[in-house]
Amino acid sequence: TFPLFTDLERELAKFKNTEKALVFNTGYMANVGTISAIADKNTIIFSDALNHASIIDGCGLSRGSVKAYNHCDVDELKYLLKEVDRNTRKLIVTDGVFSMDGDIAPLDKLYELSREYNALLMVDDAHATGTIGSGHGTAAYYGLEKEVDIQLGTLSKSLGSVGGYVAANSVIIDYLVN
């Protein structure tokens, strides 16, 4: 790895308040690559119905099964989670700010459900970084930087560059690298 990439990943991890970050060539590839790597055939992915196309494509390319819940409907998500065995691998994935209407995901409630039902929580902050709260994204907006398992984003919107990234703990980032 080039030192420049290592420096960028370190700064992104600091920016998102996570242990590590990993850069991708685009935000689209960050979503597709992360979801398809994490979700195996034994994983159920719970995806907001209005998630970005890159999330939908990542879910489709993964080997996991997908259950879409109505937009920002935490009650429906809870109902769907209740139907699944607690020991089944689960991934809840959402946009932080939805690009088509500007809604902010109820990340605080999604976090509570992720812990109650033993699920990983992933948020795509492509449209949240630089636009809400301190500019650090949805997890920071809700004060959940250390709690959200996976934060993704792009460098091509408010950060004015190219590329994408995933920020998470060392175990998740090392898994994605290997």
Language model region names:
Residues 1-6:
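A glycine-/small-polar-enriched, mobile loop at the entrance of the PLP active site in fold-type I
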Residues 9-33:
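Short loop-beta-helix segment that forms the pyridoxal 5′-phosphate
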Residues 150-152, 162-178:
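Conserved core segment of the aminotransferase class I/II
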Residues 34-53:
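Conserved PLP-anchoring active-site segment centered on the Schiff-base-forming lysine
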Residues 118, 138-156:
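Conserved active-site segment immediately N-terminal to the catalytic lysine
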Residues 41, 61-63, 147:
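Short, structured coil segments at secondary-structure junctions
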Residues 67, 71-123:
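Active-site phosphate-binding strand-loop segment of PLP-dependent enzymes
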